[in-house]
Curated annotation (Swiss-Prot):
Subcellular location: Secreted
Family affiliation: Belongs to the short scorpion toxin superfamily. Potassium channel inhibitor family. Alpha-KTx 05 subfamily.
GO (cellular component) term, any one: extracellular region
GO molecular function, one term: toxin activity
Cystine bridges: C3-C21, C8-C26, C12-C28
Name the UniProt record assigns to this protein: Potassium channel toxin alpha-KTx 5.2
Keyword Transcription: no
Effect of R7M: 35-fold and 2-fold increase in potency of inhibition of KCa2.2/KCNN2 and KCa2.3/KCNN3, respectively
Amino acid sequence: TVCNLRRCQLSCRSLGLLGKCIGVKCECVKH
């Protein structure tokens, strides 16, 4: 599967984090 950046950012934003694609993985990182 490919990382969907927009969906990744949305799900991370709800945690107060920044969404980033690392390879095929969605990573939530601090701003």
